[in-house]
A protein has these predicted regions:
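A structural "flexibility-hinge" signal
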Residues: 1-209
Length: 209
C-alpha cells in the first residue's frame, strides 16, 4: 500500500460513523472534515521546515499502536496533543477554523478529528517505514514524494491556501537529515527505541528480537 493509502485505511466508514455518533455530527460532515484534515496534517509534516520535528514525533509515538481503537486512543493521547502543538502550532487554529466552517461542524468536533487525523498520519508513516525498511532520510524522502498528491486529496472547495499550505510545493532547499539504520518490521510488543539525545543529527530505530 502507498503511504496515502496506509493513512486513509483506518479512516473508514465504521470510524466515521462512530465519530459522528460521539461528536453529534452528521456522517457526511465528519467524512468531509477527515478528508480535509488528514491531507492538511500530511502537508504540514511534509513541509521542509518540519523535518526534525516529524522524526521526533515518530520517536515519541513509536511504542503507541493506533491501528485499533483509533478514535478513542487518539482522543486520549497526550503525545498526539503535544505533537499537534509542536508541529502544527498556530497553523492548527487556522486549519481548524477553515475545516469547521467548510464542513459545518463544531470547532470542538474539528479538534477531536484533528487528533484522529494526526494519529492516523503517524501510524501510516510508521507502517510505511516498517514495510519498506526506511531510515530517517527515507521517511523524509517519502513525505517529499507525496507532496504533489496532497492538493488532489482535498475535497472540492478546499485548497492548500485555505489550510495555510500555499508554499507546500516549493522546491526543497533544506539540508537532508543524516540517515540512520533501516527500520525493520517487528510487532508492537517488540518495539524498543533508542534515541541518541547527544546527537541532533541522528536517531536510531532499534528493535528487540
Amino acid at each position: 500500500m502507498s503511504l496515502i493509502d496506509l493513512i486513509k485505511h483506518p479512516l473508514n466508514p465504521e470510524l466515521i460513523s462512530e465519530a459522528a455518533i460521539q461528536l453529534g455530527e452528521s456522517e457526511s460532515n465528519v467524512s468531509k472534515a477527515l478528508g480535509s484534515l488528514f491531507p492538511a496534517v500530511l502537508g504540514v509534516f511534509a513541509q521542509h521546515s518540519k523535518q526534525k520535528d516529524v522524526i521526533n514525533a515518530l520517536l515519541e509515538t513509536s511504542s503507541l499502536d493506533f491501528s485499533e481503537n483509533l478514535l478513542e486512543k487518539a482522543g486520549n493521547s497526550p503525545e498526539i496533543e503535544n505533537i499537534i502543538s509542536k508541529i502544527l502550532g498556530e497553523k492548527s487554529e487556522h486549519i481548524l477554523s477553515h475545516v469547521s466552517e467548510y464542513t459545518n461542524i463544531n470547532k470542538s468536533s474539528a479538534e477531536n478529528l484533528l487528533k484522529v487525523a494526526t494519529a492516523a498520519t503517524l501510524e501510516g508513516i510508521k507502517k510505511c517505514a516498517h514495510e519498506n525498511g526506511l531510515d530517517n532520510q527515507g521517511i523524509l524522502s517519502k513525505l517529499a514524494e507525496n507532496r504533489c498528491f496532497i492538493p488532489a486529496l482535498l475535497p472540492a472547495g478546499m485548497s492548500l491556501e485555505h489550510l495555510g499550505l500555499e508554499n507546500l510545493l516549493e522546491k526543497n532547499t533544506e539540508i537532508p537529515v543524516e540517515s540512520s539504520a533501516p527500520i525493520t518490521h517487528k510487532t508492537k510488543e517488540e518495539v524498543k527505541i533508542l534515541h541518541q539525545e547527544n546527537s541532533e543529527k541522528s536517531s536510531f530505530w532499534r528493535y528487540r528480537d
